[in-house]
Structures are given as C-alpha cells and as structure tokens.
Amino acid sequence: MEAERRRQAEKPKKGRVGSNLLPERHPATGTPTTTVDSSAPPCRRLPGAGGGRSRFSPQGGQRGRPHSRRRHRTTFSPVQLEQLESAFGRNQYPDIWARESLARDTGLSEARIQVWFQNRRAKQRKQERSLLQPLAHLSPAAFSSFLPESTACPYSYAAPPPPVTCFPHPYSHALPSQPSTGGAFALSHQSEDWYPTLHPAPAGHLPCPPPPPMLPLSLEPSKSWN
C-alpha cells in the first residue's frame, strides 16, 4: 500500500516538470496559458559565449578607433595681418632669420608664420589661375586687342619723313664734254642705274640712300690737270 501511495504522489510531479514545455488551456476561457516552473534550474551560460569585451565605450564611441585630434585654429589680429601682408609683398619665400624676426615683431611663433606663408602662396596661385581661366577661351585676335598699340610696331614714326631731293654731282660740271656720243650715253645710262627714280617711301620707313657713282677713268692726264 505504501508503495502505491508513493507512485501516485510522484505522478503529478512528473507532469509538473513537463508542463513548462507545452501550453495548457485555461479551464474558463479556453485560451492557452504557459506555466513556468520556478523549481527548474537556471540556464547555464556556455564558457565561450559572450566572453569578449564590448567594442563600444560607455561614452558611445568605439574603443579600437582613436579619437581624431582637434586642430588648434590661430586667429590673427588686424595689426598682425598687416605686418604679414607687407612682409609677403617684399618676399614670398622668407628664410628662417626673416621668419624669426617677423615672429618677434608680431608675437607669433615661427611655425605659425611659416604655415601662414604657405597658405598665402597657395591662395595667390589660386587667384592667378582664376584670372587666367577666362582668357584661355579667347581667340588670338581677341587676345591681341588687349595689347597696347605701341608694342605692335616699335620702330614706327609718327609722321613720314620729307622726300629726299637729288642734287647734281659736284664733278658733273667740271668734266669736259666727250666727243663721242657713245660715252655720254653710257655715262647717262650708268647714272640712271646708280640713281633710280626716287619714290615716296611708305610711312614709318626711311629710304636707303644709294651709293655714290663711279667716276670715269678715261680722262687724259693733260686735260685733267689743265
């Protein structure tokens, strides 16, 4: 008898252990309800699960990635900017002694002055490129219109020079007349070759004077001394 009582007492315990796995229906409403056995042992955590540290810090940032350093921005007073600009106008590439002298005058460090000169040179190059960019689309004829007119012809004259008049040679009257007409014709033809007809030169150019004519050497010594 005692053995049967023990078996009946153990039967509901076995049902209670499996009741946390399958839902039971409520007797009044018929809706499924789940009963949790408080006597069940708690779940064990595996030794390798969740053992690593969290990547995120309590402040919300990641531990593995360092924070970026914030740059210290230097502000210049109007007096300092004026001194730096005047020094930049004199020399765009100052040496170490010039930078140290400028640092004493402005109260800034030599490294700050060196960085300012680097930024100022980069700014000037950017301004020059922005000025030359519109001129790159112009044609050569349009670009020549920007040049002054005086550079087009540096050797031009304001007014044309007066025409040069031909004077007779001083030895033409002293020479005796030749009896033969062939010699006179040759002499006149020679003078025409050496003295071409003078035309008015174009404006801005001086005419080149012709060389002097050759004197005839067919004169007799007695007549030339008389």
Curated annotation (Swiss-Prot):
**What InterPro entries does the annotation carry?**
HD, Homeobox_CS, Homeodomain-like_sf, HTH_motif, PROP1
According to its record, what are the GO cellular component terms? chromatin; nucleus; transcription regulator complex
Read off the PROSITE patterns from this record: HOMEOBOX_1, HOMEOBOX_2
Coiled coil spans: none
Composition bias, kind Basic residues: at what positions?
A: 64-74
Question: Which tissue types show expression of this protein?
Answer: Expressed specifically in embryonic pituitary.
Molecular functions per Gene Ontology: beta-catenin binding; chromatin binding; DNA-binding transcription activator activity, RNA polymerase II-specific; DNA-binding transcription factor activity, RNA polymerase II-specific; DNA-binding transcription repressor activity, RNA polymerase II-specific; RNA polymerase II cis-regulatory region sequence-specific DNA binding; sequence-specific double-stranded DNA binding
One GO BP = apoptotic process
Biased composition of type Basic and acidic residues is found at 1-12
- Regions of compositional bias (Low complexity) in chain numbering: 216-226
Write down the DNA-binding region ranges. Answer: 69-128
Q: Which UniProt key words apply to this protein? A: Disease variant, DNA-binding, Dwarfism, Homeobox, Nucleus
Q: Which Pfam families match?
A: Homeodomain
Q: Where is this region: Disordered?
A: 1-75, 196-226
Where does the record place it? Nucleus
Chief location of this protein? Answer: nucleus
Question: Which family, according to the similarity comment?
Answer: Belongs to the paired homeobox family.
Disorder named in the UniProt entry: Pituitary hormone deficiency, combined, 2: Combined pituitary hormone deficiency is defined as the impaired production of growth hormone and one or more of the other five anterior pituitary hormones. CPHD2 is characterized by pleiotropic deficiencies of growth hormone, thyroid-stimulating hormone, follicle-stimulating hormone, luteinizing hormone, prolactin and adrenocorticotropic hormone.
What does this chain do? Possibly involved in the ontogenesis of pituitary gonadotropes, as well as somatotropes, lactotropes and caudomedial thyrotropes.
Q: What is this protein called?
A: Homeobox protein prophet of Pit-1
Origin organism is Homo sapiens
What lineage does UniProt assign to this protein's organism?
Answer: Eukaryota, Metazoa, Chordata, Craniata, Vertebrata
